[in-house]
Amino acid sequence: MKHPLCTLLSLITFMCIGSKGLAEQLTNENLTTSFLPANFHKENTVTNDWIPEGEEDEDYLDLEKLLGEDDDYIYIIDAVSPTDSESSAGNILQLFQGKSRIQRLNILNAKFAFNLYRVLKDQATTSDNLFIAPVGISTAMGMISLGLRGETHEEVHSVLHFRDFVNASSKYEVTTIHNLFRKLTHRLFRRNFGYTLRSVNGLYIQKQFPIREDFKAAMREFYFAEAQEANFPDPAFISKANNHILKLTKGLIKEALENIDPATQMLILNCIYFKGTWVNKFPVEMTHNHNFRLNEREVVKVSMMQTKGNFLAANDQELDCDILQLEYVGGISMLIVVPRKLSGMKTLEAQLTPQVVERWQKSMTNRTREVLLPKFKLEKNYNLVEVLKSMGITKLFNKNGNMSGISDQRIAIDLFKHQSTITVNEEGTQAAAVTTVGFMPLSTQVRFTVDRPFLFLVYEHRTSCLLFMGKVTNPAKS
């Protein structure tokens, strides 16, 4: 959509998730020598710039303070403001009881993600796989909301449930949200817990375009996004940006930027890359061809991984589904949700809420299980403009939107691109291929077989952050 009286702004997010070993060396475009994960703490994983020892900037040196004082800030438990609606059954504020500030924000981020997922699902066909990275989308919306005013700001805060967060406690205000996103970035992306989780936020501004200095300062303070000059009509800019994203995502996302409208004046970029190691690995020699039921009539052969170990699992009688938790090293896990009936996916998708996930997690039991899970790789590319419009965010995407906190000139967003890739396979470490796993007789253990369409949710547990979610309808398709 063109806005002749407006300049254009684009929001672009890129997400990658894999399950390969952590021994692979990391490289940086500004460095000729590769470095090992043992030195991971020396890299600023927000800006992707190498920081030589003894030359850390002030913001990075503040990390030690963040590990103490700031943890108290984000993990403090505040009283919930009483409201008439809170007493209603199933109200999400009931989940806030006993939860920290960062967990409360992430509960509402998940609520937004589930609503957005449902809109994407309605726009897709029943045979489509789906995959999104909620933390990236919420972060991008948080960044842009810094510059929104009036009704435009209210729309975003309502749909993202930021307003619900602020209203939950007399101690919360709008700035609290941005402070928590800042602390979440430190918690998730600047600490090495045994997995690789990296993020880059970028703010690209066309040369000579007037951006408010307080907006640029707030972007840096809360989201670590440094303003950089760009020449969007120049193909060299696209090439350079694509190379940067290619390296960040270890080659998983190629040609991320294809065409940028020459009228674009500002681009906000959010990239996330995750690589985790299974706690219970899938030996490669156990992978075999197995039937996967697409629907009542169609079956495809897929590469089915197999392992045995202690796993948390639950069954939901109300939604008629089974849930399995697959743990990554370091406090991240993937929930696999499988409807017992092929026709049960619609009900499951319609009723998925943070309250339901909480119920699953509280009802899980730990025992020895044999697990069969298909390998899969999903590559998805969405323009979320129409999706967000249908959810109630309209002024952000038309010429009447109030973004006066960004620039004195009128701006309209014409693109909100969300591109994501996930690879799930046997590899957890280099030794995974030669790991020997003994299997007990089936009569003495429980088998969890994922041989029909399923949902998956990837959570970081300490912050209750929903990193990724999706649906695998056909593992043989991307």
Swiss-Prot record:
Transmembrane intervals: none
Record has Isomerase as a keyword: no
Species, as recorded: Mus musculus
Alphabetical GO biological process terms: blood coagulation
Similarity-based family: Belongs to the serpin family.
Region (2 X 11 AA approximate repeats, Asp/Glu-rich (acidic) (hirudin-like)): 54-78
Name this protein carries in UniProt: Heparin cofactor 2
Sulfotyrosine PTM sites in chain numbering: 60, 73
One Pfam short name: Serpin
Residues carrying covalently attached carbohydrate according to the record: 30, 167, 366, 402
Region ranges (Glycosaminoglycan-binding site): 171-191
Site note Reactive bond, residues: 442-443
Sequence repeats: 54-64, 68-78
Tissue specificity remark: Expressed predominantly in liver.
Key words, A-Z: Blood coagulation, Glycoprotein, Hemostasis, Heparin-binding, Protease inhibitor, Repeat, Serine protease inhibitor, Signal, Sulfation
Annotated Gene Ontology cellular component terms: extracellular space
Gene Ontology molecular functions: heparin binding; serine-type endopeptidase inhibitor activity
Signal sequence extent: 1-23
Annotated InterPro entries: HCII_serpin_dom, Serpin_CS, Serpin_dom, Serpin_fam, Serpin_sf, Serpin_sf_1, Serpin_sf_2
Gene: Serpind1
Role description: Thrombin inhibitor activated by the glycosaminoglycans, heparin or dermatan sulfate. In the presence of the latter, HC-II becomes the predominant thrombin inhibitor in place of antithrombin III (AT). Also inhibits chymotrypsin, but in a glycosaminoglycan-independent manner.
Post-translational modification: N-glycosylated; different glycan composition appears to lead to two forms of this protein (68 and 72 kDa).
